[in-house]
Amino acid sequence: MALWRPGDGKVYLPPTPVSKVISTDRYVQRTNLFYYGGSSRLLTVGHPYCSLQLDGLQGKKNTIPKVSGYQYRVFRVQLPDPNKFALPDGTLYNPDTERMVWACRGIEVGRGQPLGVGTSGHPLYNRLDDTENTTLLVAESSDSRDNVSVDYKQTQLLIVGCKPPIGEHWTKGTACANPAPRPTDCPPLEFTNTTIQDGDMVETGYGAIDFAALQENKSEVPLDICTTICKYPDYLQMAAEPYGDCMFFCLRREQMFARHFFNRQGVMGEALPDSYYLKGANDKAAPGSYIYSPTPSGSMVSSDSQLFNKPYWLQRAQGHNNGICWFNELFVTVVDTTRSTNLTICTATSPPVSEYKATSFREYLRHTEEFDLQFIFQLCKIHLTPEIMAYLHNMNKALLDDWNFGVVPPPSTSLEDTYRFLQSRAITCQKGAAAPPPKEDRYAKLSFWTVDLRDKFSTDLDQFPLGRKFLLQAGPRSVSVSRKRAAPSSTPTSSPATKRKKRKQ
């Protein structure tokens, strides 16, 4: 006898359909027009450790900025609006249904100045013992800080995208109220994502943390980072970004080794468990400081391992955005610690000086940097169908407004009042139409190095170094010259002699 029984397996329903992120190659049509854009020589000079204010003087003109070889340089490259270009072909696109955008195809970041190693340090560095050389243990005292200098981790970095890069670091978190923490307890740590701005310090080998919030003695690290935040690029976050705007591609090279090994002086906040050691006599009854910390070193710099002063061509980006510069902007993030030489400058207190005396001279410190940015851009167009416009609006609502695509209000059918004398005391105050609000800069509260290329585009690629390299890799520029002798131009008047055929007998 056959009986029906319900199935024991679970019923799986299909997932709810969601909108997919598509590549820009699906809706961006590339043209055969290429443009070169390049900056002038970009220079910056300042103090490598801190920003200084001249005595008794105020204002930016009397401020010496902080310029270090261990800072991020984030260039905000402003491009011209291609929809306002005088194009050589007027039929290239339809302004009613299409919009033009730029695609980055090539970039070269030029770096001037010689290779060099820059050092940093602290005149009151928290070091107790040289834990590598055990014979050099110092006597316990209330203050064993010493003047120590280091050369940081060596880093070369290049990130290109149409949005600023995302950084990560650890900072002081919020502890739970129950139980209430004591003021001397180790604070909880919180992982934080922030935008990397121009002038932020790179991770130098001491960790990506907020030193101002987590190191209150200001002696754990060198001077240039003891009151600031060291950020590390969040490659995982930028690689997982849905639209791929923060990082079209990146190049990085890091190297470091530990030069010295110290331990920290202070009261151990967390005592070692007794099971970890056997107590001794006299000064060995209790262990000393076990907070060990090395000093980093970036080792040798060489021109054989340089990421800069060479071109890079973008054929396929790692994300869905294949080099399209939304809002006509491009962000280039550069770190190069292989040119971090600090210049020492000396002036005499009362010239002329005939005999050396240390108090007769004043010592100063400066750091200089030199950059040159070159780009190859390709002109592209987007056919704005309803589906594409809905997708772009979902990606960024301000993009269509930037292209002057807005909602047109319906015409008013009500009867409006219009006075003859608008400036009259006999009638109520007439308020004019409200002025449209100015466009807000999305990055007004952030600091970047602005590079304006809106009037520096050219189609003559062969007149610029990067343009010639682009033409060379795109194909040969001229036909090879033949070494064969040319045939005579004139034709003989007489006909050539013909061979007489032999007849068979």
UniProtKB/Swiss-Prot annotation:
Which GO biological process entries does UniProt record here? endocytosis involved in viral entry into host cell; virion attachment to host cell
List where in the cell it is found.
Virion; Host nucleus
Gene name, per UniProt, is L1
Please describe what this protein does: Forms an icosahedral capsid with a T=7 symmetry and a 50 nm diameter. The capsid is composed of 72 pentamers linked to each other by disulfide bonds and associated with L2 proteins. Binds to heparan sulfate proteoglycans on cell surface of basal layer keratinocytes to provide initial virion attachment. This binding mediates a conformational change in the virus capsid that facilitates efficient infection. The virion enters the host cell via endocytosis. During virus trafficking, L1 protein dissociates from the viral DNA and the genomic DNA is released to the host nucleus.
Q: Which organism is it from?
A: Human papillomavirus type 61
Q: Which residues form a coiled coil?
A: none
Recorded hits in InterPro entries, A to Z, give: Capsid_L1_Papillomavir, Capsid_L1_sf_Papillomavir, dsDNA_vir_gr_I_capsid
Q: What's in the keyword line of the UniProt record? A: Capsid protein, Disulfide bond, Host nucleus, Host-virus interaction, Late protein, T=7 icosahedral capsid protein, Viral attachment to host cell, Viral penetration into host cytoplasm, Virion, Virus endocytosis by host, Virus entry into host cell
Would you tell me the protein name for this molecule? Answer: Major capsid protein L1
Compositional bias annotation for Low complexity? 487-497
Secretion signal: which residues? none
Upper classification of the organism: Viruses, Monodnaviria, Shotokuvirae, Cossaviricota, Papovaviricetes
Task: Kindly list the residue ranges recorded as spanning the membrane.
Answer: none
Q: Which Gene3D superfamilies match?
A: Major capsid L1 (late) superfamily, Papillomavirus
